[in-house]
Amino acid sequence: VPSLQHLKDGYYQILMRESDIPFTAVSTPSGMLWEWLVMPQGLSNAPATFNRFVSHILRSVRDFAPSYFDDIFVHSRAMNGMTDLEVHRMHFRRVMEIMKVNKLYSNLKKCIFAAFEIPVLGCFVGKDGVRPDPEKIKAINEWPTPQNVKNLRQFLGLATYLHKYSKNYAGIVHPLSQLLKKDQEWQWTDECQNAFLTLKKSLTEAPILALPNPDKPFYVVCDASNFAIGNALMQRDDDGHERVISYCSRQLRGAERNYPVHDKELLSMKYALAKHRVHLLGPEPFTVFTDHASLRTAIKSPHLSQRMARWLSFFSEYNFTVEYKP
């Protein structure tokens, strides 16, 4: 059960230190000087100060009440024989007590209490997982065929924002990205049109991504093609079904396209571990699945190129096993 607390007036809830008040003086057309008694917007250290302040006072409840600037996200699950709503009520009360002691005030018009899902940084998070903003999906679905480079850049800007919901995004978008190269003549071919329609379909039919559960093992599925690499971070839910937490992909750079297939697959694995480092780095073991069987023994081979030796040094930070999955 999630809830959203939106703090009222943000920066203005932090008082200025008395000795710093004169430094905030601003001149008005009437010739008068006005000084800020609370922290104004525009100071270079204001965002960090505000975020640090909110995070600090909520440090004792950060396991179920993380914050991001003026938003506090309270989430709860059933535990110890209590329902999720009962646990949520207890968690929410603790957060409110902390806010009361520290004189933090909420904007009730923007707060959401015990909802099915809440908006978080451009997406919606709920019990079932994470889904994209329907307004952005609608914009993608209704986007007309680009007529020039500017139109294409605008479309890809929005599409890239949603790329974590699309399997093999980099591979699909490859023909379109070629049109953005310097001195490239604009030619909208059938291949570009198919890529455009495929990308729209991939995003409009985006799956609901699962929320990561640190108590369950992670596994990563990697793959590589002639011009792109991609991966998916996954877990199994309580019913044993595979759930995707995030898709991730990118196109191969100039020199990387000349790598042999073995090295491309290994690069895909390295890219996956780097992208999902926050979830995978640690003592808990996880599994990497690949469709290239030789990678199972690559990390133990005594004959390594300098490039592979560097990559294996990177892999040594992680506790994982490689399994073949055709």
For each predicted feature, which ranges?
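Retroelement reverse transcriptase polymerase core
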Residues: 1-287, 294-311, 317-320, 325-326
